[in-house]
């Protein structure tokens, strides 16, 4: 059992090292995309399922409340947080539309959709991205594996942060670290004196 525990830590560390080599440019581009949207008076919509949904909610909560230092609230909505909306749409046999309907209702040109999907193939996330495209929104996608269907939907203005792993658990861990990096970069860019 002890060796298995050490193996989990070792695999996580190796994934972090690979990500630290592969992802800084994409994370920087994503942070700048998010910052520019916020500076323009827009908002961030976030979505994900399961652990990816927890990461989406963490991102939205951090923007609304704070990351590591006090600062003004920033507009973000986790589309997976409202169980009444989700079950109302799902009850009408439109499970694939649970996020897309919200994007069409709440999203505007200049907003950003933060879409988190470990494999990039979740139908409801794919449909949310398709809806965001019709609303002239920019997409920041956190993925893993080969990026899945989601990667193929992204345009030049969009950013994919693809974790270099084929293990869902490691990808989810790195998505959380990436979300924290994005929050740190947003705070340090928008509020440099408060972040010191």
UniProtKB/Swiss-Prot annotation:
One of its GO terms (biological process) is DNA replication. Gene3D superfamilies: Glucose-6-phosphate isomerase like protein, domain 1. Keywords: DNA replication. GO terms for molecular function: carbohydrate derivative binding. Required for the timely initiation of chromosomal replication via direct interactions with the DnaA initiator protein. Belongs to the SIS family. DiaA subfamily. HAMAP family: SIS_DiaA. This is DnaA initiator-associating protein DiaA. It comes from Edwardsiella ictaluri (strain 93-146). The lineage of its organism: Bacteria, Pseudomonadati, Pseudomonadota, Gammaproteobacteria, Enterobacterales. The gene is diaA.
């Amino acid at each position: 059992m002890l060796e298995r525990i050490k193996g989990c830590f070792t695999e996580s560390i190796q994934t972090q090292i690979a990500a630290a080599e592969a992802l800084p440019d994409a994370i920087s581009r994503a942070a700048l995309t998010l910052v520019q949207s916020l500076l323009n008076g827009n908002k961030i919509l976030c979505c994900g399922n399961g652990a990816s949904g927890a990461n989406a909610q963490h991102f939205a909560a951090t923007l609304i409340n704070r990351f590591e230092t006090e600062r003004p609230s920033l507009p973000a909505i986790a589309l997976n947080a409202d169980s009444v909306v989700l079950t109302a749409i799902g009850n009408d046999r439109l499970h694939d539309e649970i996020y897309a309907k919200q994007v069409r209702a709440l999203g505007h040109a200049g907003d950003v959709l933060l879409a988190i999907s470990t494999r990039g193939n979740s139908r409801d996330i794919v449909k949310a991205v398709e809806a965001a495209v019709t609303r002239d929104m920019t997409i920041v996608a956190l993925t893993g594996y080969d990026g899945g269907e989601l990667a193929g939907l992204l345009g030049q203005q969009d950013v994919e942060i693809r974790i270099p792993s084929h293990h869902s658990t490691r990808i989810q861990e790195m998505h959380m670290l990436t979300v924290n990096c994005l929050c740190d970069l947003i705070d340090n860019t928008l509020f440099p004196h408060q972040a010191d």
